Amino acid sequence: MAPKKKEVTRIAKLNLIGGQAKPGPALASVGINMAEFTKSFNDKTKDQNGKVIPVIITAYKDKSFDYVIKTTPVTFLLKDIAKIKSGAKDPKKQTVATISKEQALEIARYKLIDMTAYDEEAALRMIAGSAKQMGIVIEGVSAYKEKKGN
């Protein structure tokens, strides 16, 4: 006979700072042992200290938990590479930074495991779309797929 499955009480999606998670209201609402979670999370993310790390926490009725660490959001990576604090207020009229195609490809390769893109080219277009919405230009890359023919 298969072992009984634990009863899930909550699934929470949080953005925490790598290596610096602390017990607080966001974690308290999940209903887990906060000290145990923060110690484990900080140990696993100490190499990403200071970066925003999305985490999905599954809390069970017996107060145990599982969690999955995701990759840093594209917007944070773009701001970090472009060395800006925020995107453009009106990205259609304003450009706040320009990054190289190689820098964008680096982000695409890093994010590929969490994206729905099938290859680097599709991931690069997704990164370009996010960059465009922030007022960041990627040299030599369009957010749109070029049509063949015509």
UniProtKB/Swiss-Prot annotation:
Keywords linked to the UniProt accession: Methylation, Ribonucleoprotein, Ribosomal protein, RNA-binding, rRNA-binding
GO cellular component: cytosolic large ribosomal subunit
Pfam families membership: Ribosomal_L11, Ribosomal_L11_N
InterPro entries per the UniProt record, alphabetical: Ribosomal_uL11 (IPR000911), Ribosomal_uL11_bac-typ (IPR006519), Ribosomal_uL11_C (IPR020783), Ribosomal_uL11_C_sf (IPR036769), Ribosomal_uL11_CS (IPR020785), Ribosomal_uL11_N (IPR020784), Ribosomal_uL11_N_sf (IPR036796)
CDD domains: Ribosomal_L11
Post-translational modification: One or more lysine residues are methylated.
GO biological process: translation
Coiled-coil intervals: none
GO molecular function, one term: large ribosomal subunit rRNA binding
Protein name, UniProt field: Large ribosomal subunit protein uL11
Gene, per the UniProt record: rplK
